[in-house]
Amino acid sequence: MNPLYLASGSPRRRELLTQIGVPFTAISADIDETPLADESPAAYVERLARGKAAAGRGLITSSESQAPACVLGADTAVVLDGRILGKPLDQADALQMLMALSGREHEVFTAIALLDGERCESRVVRSLVRFRPISPAEAALYWASGEPCDKAGGYAIQGLAAVFVAGLNGSYSAVVGLPVCETAELLGHFGIPCWQNLPVR
């Protein structure tokens, strides 16, 4: 079986991949995440997921892997009114994002890409998240927690921001950062089964 590498520094993605029982090695693959002119959110996250997988594959030396390695890349974007909300630059940016999301529905696009050196397959998952109204005081308190700093859209659905979520249509795990169902399907296409750590009965 081909060894699997996760080209991501995200603890959330590592947890989700561990959850489906797939052994992997995490590597960091930094790429330029600047959106291209007139690039749709779906095309943007797919390009970045593929780029991260390719960058990760470039970091693996032949001595590290006797079998051809598979590299999984992923990217998530929060989108409001067609505009991609990245990671907040500072407190003012984070508070502005939270107040813009307050009481409204927004889109979350997450892409995954799996590359083995010969082929690359990818998937894009779109989810809708609806926030209840958020007061400026709540937004400031949430910022002070430190949680929004490195999150797309300035919030973590699996963390303290769960109290803001009034509804979700789509994949919860995709909003967190890795669509588990689609990831398992893609891994299967490359001969990597899930639940490898289950005890034999």
UniProtKB/Swiss-Prot annotation:
EC category: hydrolase
Protein keywords: Cytoplasm, Hydrolase, Nucleotide metabolism
GO molecular function: dTTP diphosphatase activity; UTP diphosphatase activity
EC numbers on record: 3.6.1.9
Reaction equations catalysed: dTTP + H2O = dTMP + diphosphate + H(+); UTP + H2O = UMP + diphosphate + H(+)
Lineage: superkingdom: Bacteria
Cytoplasm in keyword set: yes
PANTHER family documented for this protein: BIFUNCTIONAL DTTP/UTP PYROPHOSPHATASE/METHYLTRANSFERASE PROTEIN-RELATED, BIFUNCTIONAL DTTP_UTP PYROPHOSPHATASE_METHYLTRANSFERASE PROTEIN-RELATED
Similarity remark: Belongs to the Maf family. YhdE subfamily.
UniProt name for this protein: dTTP/UTP pyrophosphatase
Origin species: Pseudomonas fluorescens (strain ATCC BAA-477 / NRRL B-23932 / Pf-5)
